[in-house]
Amino acid sequence: MPENYTPAAAATGTWTEEEIRHQPRAWIRSLTNIDALRSALNNFLEPLLRKENLRIILTGAGTSAFIGDIIAPWLASHTGKNFSAVPTTDLVTNPMDYLNPAHPLLLISFGRSGNSPESVAAVELANQFVPECYHLPITCNEAGALYQNAINSDNAFALLMPAETHDRGFAMTSSITTMMASCLAVFAPETINSQTFRDVADRCQAILTTLGDFSEGVFGYAPWKRIVYLGSGGLQGAARESALKVLELTAGKLAAFYDSPTGFRHGPKSLVDDETLVVVFVSSHPYTRQYDLDLLAELRRDNQAMRVIAIAAESSDIVAAGPHIILPPSRHFIDVEQAFCFLMYAQTFALMQSLHMGNTPDTPSASGTVNRVVQGVIIHPWQA
């Protein structure tokens, strides 16, 4: 490497860095567009949401699937509707387990490219299995199959994200968060909309501004060999996505794991050693937060990990007893909003860890065996 090489300098000019940095602007652009589409969206959705026994499945592959993991629990509790998260990779292999012909279905398909074989096949299988099936694809690619098929369908409403969210880098960054914010705004507009979400955008922008040129490293630099992200409820989905970002951008050179704080005790905690970094996403809900802090204190008492870092909206004696990050000041955030803040740190950590290990984050898979749009999938026709 040249003598003046630094990870921060290498990040400059990558698509991945640009796509991380433009997220707050992209969210407001998309939610403003949803404001303009509200009447048309309501015309499509309101008759469906009145149907008894309507199932709403949030689906996608990889990172796109984790959107459902993050937001489905809150959407279900907030709206009282039957939201669930099922990856396309499960719908395609086991449609008989998830698609019930007796219940009307709204399939919300997330996709950056909209061309993943499983995503296209999941739509076809849903139509094949469920007589009363409707579709709301939320995608970043106007030319993708998900979008194009939907605009030519009578049972679908296609929602297109701003063009800049069709990430050119290998890993999904602005695409996941913009699709996530947009789905929340569609189904919970009284809570998530282009005005209220400015608080989230501003807080995340403050995080990115505080991180500067990323030269310091989000969690510092140390010779760790493993990272574990922990989060409760929907934040476990954010932890899962955070772990995947590290695996993708380091091409597996840094092993990454995720769990819930309570689940981590039941075996997975065995992986913690003196080369392990643990990051705890602390819930903003006062009840859930107790469990997060219990595990945080326990991990620090164990003194097995190289470092245990808490990221929280507010400090406490337990949080402050070890390495921690306090989110920039703002109003109280519910966890589904706070997830966006946690992902800013996780995406930036993955980018800088990739560069620190000598990878090229826009194309981290030197072998070419892992692709931006998955390849090698054979879709087998369903035969009842």
UniProtKB/Swiss-Prot annotation:
What Enzyme Commission number(s) apply to this enzyme? 3.5.99.-
Tell me which InterPro entries the record gives: GatZ_KbaZ_carbometab, GlmS/AgaS_SIS, SIS_AgaS, SIS_dom, SIS_dom_sf, Sugar_isomerase_AgaS
Q: What is this protein called?
A: D-galactosamine-6-phosphate deaminase AgaS
| Lineage, highest ranks first | Bacteria, Pseudomonadati, Pseudomonadota, Gammaproteobacteria, Enterobacterales
- UniProt function note: Catalyzes the isomerization-deamination of galactosamine 6-phosphate to form tagatofuranose 6-phosphate and ammonium ion.
Q: Which GO terms describe its biological process?
A: carbohydrate derivative metabolic process; phosphoenolpyruvate-dependent sugar phosphotransferase system
Q: Does the keyword Plastid apply?
A: no
Q: Which GO terms describe its cellular component?
A: plasma membrane
Q: What induces it?
A: Induced by growth on N-acetyl-D-galactosamine.
Q: Give the catalysed reaction(s), semicolon-separated.
A: D-galactosamine 6-phosphate + H2O = D-tagatopyranose 1-phosphate + NH4(+)
Tell me the protein family, please: Belongs to the SIS family. AgaS subfamily.
Q: Which organism is it from?
A: Escherichia coli
Q: Which UniProt keywords apply?
A: Carbohydrate metabolism, Hydrolase, Repeat
- Domain (SIS): residue spans on this chain: 45-197, 215-364
Q: What happens when the gene is disrupted?
A: Deletion mutant does not grow on N-acetyl-D-galactosamine or D-galactosamine.
Q: Does the keyword Ribosomal protein apply?
A: no
Tell me which Pfam families the record gives.
SIS
**Xref: CDD domains:** SIS_AgaS_like, SIS_GlmS_GlmD_1
Q: Name one GO molecular function term.
A: isomerase activity
Lineage top rank: taxon: Bacteria
